[in-house]
Amino acid sequence: MTESKYTGVFAFEGDWHRNLRNMSSMRPTLETLRDIFGADGLKFSHRRIGTADELEYYVDKWLSEEPGESYDDYRVGYFAFHGEQGLISPGGGDVSLDDLAGWINGRAQGRTLYFASCSTLDLETETIKDFLRSTGARAVVGSTKSVFNLELAAFDLLLLDSLAYYHRRPHAADNYLRSPKRPHFQAFVEELGLIIITPSSKP
């Protein structure tokens, strides 16, 4: 890769199981990406989320412009939750994309929103672009299908690396992952129904 330096990832992760003894987490994926490249690699902030109110609180923290509280160098928002069409599920109630857009309220300029969840973006392109405009985000990324957590975690090593590296040009990440030179990447993209929507995306 020959682009700009990595931006950080601000990760919001819900509970994957009702039994809280189960320690399933996407955090090791983030730690791998951090550790593989050392000081030059990906940095992250990771928060476990149990309720919609907690998600709203930490989204507001992520987007804060208060002195000493800025996360402007964490330009990828990683939303790892159970999901379904147009929704993510922190555990204590569902959150719609409309809810999330209202919380963000246009403050996600220059950021990428990645939904690591089942079917959240199984929507018309124009509906997703409406969400994009409402949030002010540079790109919205996610799956149109139900996904298996292990497959998603494996692909997230590639996807998060690309999104954080090409954060100023998300379409370049899309091109990288879909390149005919990388058919093994393409297979993951198709299996997960991955889409990367930007303001210039066609229906």
Regions picked out by a protein language model, each given a short descriptive name:
Residues D35-F37, S70-D73, A101-I104, R138-V141, ...:
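Glycine-rich loops and low-complexity Gly/Arg-rich segments
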Residues M1-Y74, I88, G110, F115-A116, ...:
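A domain-level signal for caspase-like cysteine endopeptidase catalytic cores
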Residues W16-H17, E84, T120, V147:
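Conserved beta-strand elements of beta-rich interaction domains across eukaryotes
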Residues T120-P203:
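Active-site-proximal C-terminal subdomain of hydrolase catalytic domains
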Residues S64-G68, R75, S96-N105, E124-K129:
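Short, charged beta->alpha transition segments
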Residues F79-A80, P90-G91, L113-L121, S143:
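Short His-Asn-centered micro-motif
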Residues F81-T112:
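A short, glycine/acidic-enriched catalytic loop
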